Swiss-Prot record:
This is Endosome-associated-trafficking regulator 1. Residues 159-174 have a biased composition (Polar residues). One of its GO terms (cellular component) is centrosome. Signal peptide: none annotated. The gene is ENTR1. Endosome-associated protein that plays a role in membrane receptor sorting, cytokinesis and ciliogenesis. Involved in the endosome-to-plasma membrane trafficking and recycling of SNX27-retromer-dependent cargo proteins, such as GLUT1. Involved in the regulation of cytokinesis; the function may involve PTPN13 and GIT1. Plays a role in the formation of cilia. Involved in cargo protein localization, such as PKD2, at primary cilia. Involved in the presentation of the tumor necrosis factor (TNF) receptor TNFRSF1A on the cell surface, and hence in the modulation of the TNF-induced apoptosis. Phosphorylated. One of its GO terms (biological process) is cell projection organization. The keyword Transport applies. It comes from Bos taurus (Bovine). Belongs to the ENTR1 family.
Amino acid sequence: MAGYARRPGVTPLSRARSLVIPDDDKLGDLEAANPFSFKEFLKTKNLSLSKEDTDSRVYSQEATRHSLGLDRTSPASQTVGYGLEYQQPFFEDPTGAGDLLDEDEDEEDGWNGAYLPSAMEQTHSSRVAASTSPCSTYVSFFSNPSELVGPESLPPWTLSDSDSRISPTGSPSADFTAHGESLGDRHLRTLQISYEALKDENSKLRRKLTEIQSFSETQTEMVRTLERKLEAKMIKEESDYHDLESVVQQVEQNLELMTKRAVKAENHVLKLRQEVSLLQAQVSDFKRENEALRSGQGASLTVVKQNTDVALQNLRVVMNNAHASIKQLVSGAETLNLVAEILKSIDRISEIKDQGEES
């Protein structure tokens, strides 16, 4: 039933929606890998509904053959010779799911994509025109999709010669009608159950979508906050890097200066060591000279002492000689004084004699 042509101009009621979350490509893979996901649920239910619909279609075709008096081995194209040309089978949705889903499509703008399960497409594809008879609904249900073109051009029924006993104006038998109604009710109940299940699943998915959207917004805000923090941290790290680079350059310059100073200091130390060695040699020479001088000074002192002793002795001798000469001079002076006195007394005596003679 999922392969029927879709009626143009009719909005499909099974338009599924998928949440598109940016930068999260793994969500679809995780949902596809989850056996309890909504897709797996729809796939299982669609398989069961397709199998059940196939069985009911086979059973309905057999019942139609039996009620119309056709052979069991006749082909499917001759089973129903009505010549109806519908575009696809149409069933009215008794629950009004089309309006509800159309309102939901207007409310939800954030959904996109399309996922068309066969059960929903089978149920809510199109509606039959108002002029179509109730019997044609069941006829379209039991007919092949290729034989259904549309309700506008309905030629009169054309039956084969073997089936000429069936009149196009005649009504179906009671068994056929009851069987068709039971199949329609059964199919309607199945569709209602599937619709309720899909509705519950849709509400759950909406709640889950709301939670995912809030979680996505929270994660987006967190990512933005982390991006801002990361940018600030990167700016700070870049400034720290530039500061550290300048500090490293200064340290390298200081190391070069210290290296040059260390080389100069080593050269200066070598010169000082050479000078110290020279000074030590000079000190040793001075020590030897001092010792030599000390030894020579002792010898000269003895000589000087001897010379001074000799000089003292000579001085004493000279003093003694001087005293003796001085004594001699004094005695000679006294003698001279005595001679002078004698001479004076002689002169006086002669003068007295002269005066006495003159007188």
